[in-house]
């Protein structure tokens, strides 16, 4: 199964302390966060990786290359095969998926590039295949649900609503937060009604059209940048 890692964010919240390196390259225990992710994937047999990059993406590409080289941090092979998609303009947190649609011919893992996790990906994939959803999200409780995006699901685990952290939360809710790990069937991109040729082009306000898929599952938000 291919893994797509989204590494195109600007990391504005940490820019005051790490403005010269992209957030996925911040070192934790001597190596970049993204390297921890790739190690976890490799150890579980997920070695076909496509990374979307934008802001300071050249630093990510220079460090990892195509994945066939040696880690400067560990002195060991990365042991994965890496391709890149470079966003010339920010496309939103899902816009790049429409640009690489031709490379996605089967279900794929979709990960954020700036998270540390200890996850059994094979078990995650097995759950996805058993339940047959277009999208499967990995969720978890956290210590600050009041300012986090929340997943509202029914008793069977089917996602009913995705509440962004900016939106009003119900008074009573389950502490279930999106972990930034997903499995998608590629056809979900075809069901959004978004023309991939418009993503990144200039909209009515003269700014690039961006796409976000972080509001409701199966309902994309296509908007012009403001």
Whereabouts are the PLM-identified features?
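N-proximal low-complexity "stem/linker" segments adjacent to membrane-targeting elements
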Residues: 1-18, 25
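Conserved N-terminal catalytic core of the sugar/cofactor nucleotidyltransferase
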Residues: 2-5, 27-123
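Hydrophobic packing residues within well-ordered alpha-helices of enzyme cores
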Residues: 14, 60-64, 192
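Short, well-ordered beta-strand micro-motif
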Residues: 27, 139, 152, 183-185
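Catalytic-core segments of class I nucleotidyltransferases/pyrophosphorylases
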Residues: 108-109, 116, 122-129, 142-145, ...
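A short, conserved acidic/glycine-rich loop-to-beta-strand motif
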Residues: 131-141
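Short acidic-glycine loop/turn motifs at beta-strand connectors
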Residues: 152-158
């Amino acid at each position: 199964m291919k893994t797509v890692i989204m590494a195109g964010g600007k990391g504005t919240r940490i820019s005051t302390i790490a403005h010269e390196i992209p957030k996925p390259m911040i070192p934790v225990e001597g190596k970049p966060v993204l390297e921890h992710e790739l190690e976890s994937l490799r150890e579980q047999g997920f070695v076909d990786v496509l990374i979307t990059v934008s802001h300071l993406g050249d630093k990510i590409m220079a460090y990892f290359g195509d994945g066939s080289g040696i880690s400067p941090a560990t002195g060991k092979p990365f042991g994965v095969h890496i391709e890149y998609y470079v966003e010339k303009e920010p496309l939103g947190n899902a816009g790049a998926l429409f640009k690489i649609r031709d490379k996605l011919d089967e279900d794929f893992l979709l990960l954020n590039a700036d998270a540390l996790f200890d996850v059994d990906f094979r078990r995650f994939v097995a759950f996805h295949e058993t339940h047959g959803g277009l999208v499967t999200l990995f969720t978890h409780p956290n210590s600050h649900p009041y300012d986090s995006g929340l997943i509202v699901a029914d008793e069977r685990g089917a996602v009913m609503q995705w509440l962004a952290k900016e939106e009003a939360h119900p008074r009573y809710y389950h502490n279930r937060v999106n972990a930034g790990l997903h499995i998608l069937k590629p056809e979900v991109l075809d069901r959004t009604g978004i023309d991939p040729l418009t993503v990144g082009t200039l909209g009515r306000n003269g700014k690039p059209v961006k796409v976000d898929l972080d509001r409701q599952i199966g309902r994309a938000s296509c908007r012009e940048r403001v």
